[in-house]
Amino acid sequence: MLSGIGGQAARAAALWLTPEPAQHGTPTPTHPHSHAPPLPRTPTPSHPHSRAPPLPRAPTPTHPHSHAPPLPRTPEIHPTQTGKRYKSKPLFPNRQQKSPEFFIRANTKDPLVCGARVFHFSPPRHGLAGVVGAARDHPAPDPPLPTNTGGVPYCFPSSRVDAPCSPDHGCRDRRLRKSRAPTRVPWSNSMFPTGVIQRLFHSDAGAVGYSGGITWLPAVSGSRVRRLQPGTAARSRVAMFPVWSTRTTLRVARLPGTLPRPPRPRSSAGAEGGFLLSPSQGTDGPARGGGSGGGRGPGGGRGGPRGSRGRGGRGRGGRGGGRRGRQGGPGPTLAAPPRP
């Protein structure tokens, strides 16, 4: 009986110690009793006992033991040194600068004005960059600047210019023309950069429309321009000024050498028109009583004395006549001034 119990125990122990075959028939290397070859282990460079070569480390210039070349350091700019590059320079370096020939405001968005008769540049207000002041309060420079426009040459680049504006060098804009050659600005057609003009202007070259973008535009000139609206023509080519907005009233003083503006008549009699610095001779327009008389040239018409209410023709010369008056004939045509 004992031998039978011992045989059963031996058989049970043999069955318990015999390893069971794998479920899928493939040896599992991770099993502790598996006879499969171990999996290849990849060397871990980060392990302290690993024999793998270390990973390539990128040189860090900021590391104290690095052999990499140092990074280029940007020069530190002191707060008091900003804007020194764009300070004003005399137009004529060989003589003392006394006349207001060159005016600049550094580190501002105001356009630069270079000319012989510019003495005041108001701060921007409502988008207006500046207004040319009255030049009669200051004497003409010596030597005078050449002109062939009937007025005074002006140049309107941006506020960052690497050279003074002069008839010999022109104007070089540092912001818009960094890699180009120095740009010579034609004095017969002064120019200024802008990026906000989206109106139609009448310039010296005619009516040209611009739709924005940083481009060089012909300067809008005139002393009687009140509001720059689409189709507005300059009444007199006696001054040049930059325009950055079309919603501000412009008032430009009259320069020496031009006729004064005729006084506004308060009676029914018409007033004779004034000169217009125009390249072409114009004819007198019809001057019906009460309206504005004048042609489209240097001459101005005369309004009628009395009669029924009428409206005169449009003219650049002068405004004559009262509200009531008879139809009057055209006034005398004034001779055009000699062109320079």
From Swiss-Prot:
Residues 308-326 have a biased composition (Basic residues). Keywords: Repeat. Residues 287-307 have a biased composition (Gly residues). It comes from the Viruses. Residues 35-73 have a biased composition (Pro residues). Residues 13-96, 254-340 are annotated as: Disordered. Residues 27-75 are annotated as: 2 X 17 AA repeats. The keyword Signal does not apply. The keyword Cell cycle does not apply. Sequence repeats lie at residues 27-43, 59-75. This is Latency-related protein 1. It comes from Human herpesvirus 1 (strain F) (HHV-1).
